[in-house]
């Protein structure tokens, strides 16, 4: 591709919240704390599951993969946001913007499918406990995880390559916190109708279909919970399901609002706030919701902490 014939833009400017300079320092502090807590929470989960052989079962190995995705997702996005918030104008090269968009789509797409696989795993465990070892054997688990990662790679490769094959004639100011498809697409000086059809169809398949499957799985799970004889058990199960559904609704709902119609009528500031839900909040909440409330995870964490204290004592 001859870049000079197709595009005169060699770098982009990320504007961030430049319309609200008085808020940027406070936002920098909040985002930094969220980033550190996200990394720590997901790192703890990764270490706990990796070191405890008894947790090497599909349920926890799915969590391990989710934690890797969340750490990677945050590492691709948040440092750039912090730079944007700490400077008046942040420059990012054409190649740098391409790379960031690619990895955002890779990890975001992988998470969409991975959360669906995790919901299926919980559905099989709760609704078909006797057949669970057969339904979710190691082979099925590996296929679901590999499918999630390969799907994420394919989504990222197709969408990013397509977006950056368009000509960019200027202006080069991206009114966003990072290089994401919708705000970058607004700078394209060509007809993007076919891409928008692809984006609409792709979002339905990648975001809406897994989300609907998750909802159906949890409806079946809720019916199974209602049959539990123990009131305490029902309350605990309902609480867990409610927190899981809150997390997936936040993630899929906001991602759907962003990607279903890339050139939607939302204001730039609204788009930024929506994007923060699935780029900042869900990576922060998922460790708390999926893992740190889990009794087995907490027991393992306490054991590791005690072992560390004993080693330091001697």
UniProtKB/Swiss-Prot annotation:
One of its GO terms (molecular function) is olfactory receptor activity. One of its GO terms (cellular component) is plasma membrane. The chain crosses the membrane at residues 26-46, 55-75, 100-120, 140-160, 198-217, 238-258, 272-292. Residues 1-25, 76-99, 161-197, 259-271 are extracellular. Disulfide bonds join 97-189. Glycans are attached at residue 5. It is found in: Cell membrane. Signal peptide: none annotated. Residues 47-54, 121-139, 218-237, 293-314 are cytoplasmic. It is a multi-pass membrane protein. InterPro entries: GPCR_Rhodpsn (IPR000276), GPCR_Rhodpsn_7TM (IPR017452), Olfact_rcpt (IPR000725). One of its GO terms (biological process) is sensory perception of smell. Its main location: membrane. Coiled coil: none annotated. It holds the Pfam family 7tm_4. Keywords: Cell membrane, Disulfide bond, G-protein coupled receptor, Glycoprotein, Membrane, Olfaction, Receptor, Sensory transduction, Transducer, Transmembrane, Transmembrane helix. Belongs to the G-protein coupled receptor 1 family. Odorant receptor. This is Olfactory receptor 10A3.
């Amino acid at each position: 591709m001859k870049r000079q014939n197709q595009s005169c833009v060699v770098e982009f400017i990320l504007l961030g919240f430049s319309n609200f300079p008085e808020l940027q320092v406070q936002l920098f502090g909040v985002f930094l704390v969220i980033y550190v807590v996200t990394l720590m929470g997901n790192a703890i989960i990764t270490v706990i599951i990796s070191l405890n052989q008894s947790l090497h079962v599909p349920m926890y190995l799915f969590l391990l993969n989710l934690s890797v995705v969340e750490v990677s997702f945050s590492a691709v996005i948040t440092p750039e946001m912090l730079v944007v918030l700490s400077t008046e104008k942040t420059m990012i090269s054409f190649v740098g913007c391409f790379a960031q968009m690619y990895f955002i789509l890779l990890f975001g797409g992988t998470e969409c499918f991975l959360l669906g696989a995790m919901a299926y795993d919980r559905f099989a465990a709760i609704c078909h406990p006797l057949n669970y070892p057969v339904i979710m054997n190691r082979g099925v688990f590996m296929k679901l995880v590999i499918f999630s990662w390969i799907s994420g790679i394919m989504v990222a490769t197709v969408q990013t390559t397509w977006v950056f094959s368009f000509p960019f004639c200027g202006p080069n100011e991206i009114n966003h916190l990072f290089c994401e498809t919708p705000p970058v697409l607004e700078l394209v000086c060509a007809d993007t109708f076919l891409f928008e059809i692809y984006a609409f169809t792709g979002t339905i398949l990648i975001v809406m279909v897994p989300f609907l499957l998750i909802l159906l799985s949890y409806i079946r799970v809720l019916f199974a919970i209602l049959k539990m004889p123990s009131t305490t058990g029902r309350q605990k199960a309902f609480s867990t399901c409610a927190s899981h559904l809150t997390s997936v609704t936040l993630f899929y709902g906001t991602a759907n609002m962003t990607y279903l119609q890339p050139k939607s009528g939302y204001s730039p500031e609204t788009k930024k706030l929506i994007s923060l839900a699935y780029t900042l909040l869900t990576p922060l909440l998922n460790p708390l919701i999926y893992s740190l409330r889990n009794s087995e995870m907490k027991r393992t964490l306490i054991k590791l902490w005690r072992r560390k204290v004993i080693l330091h004592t001697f």
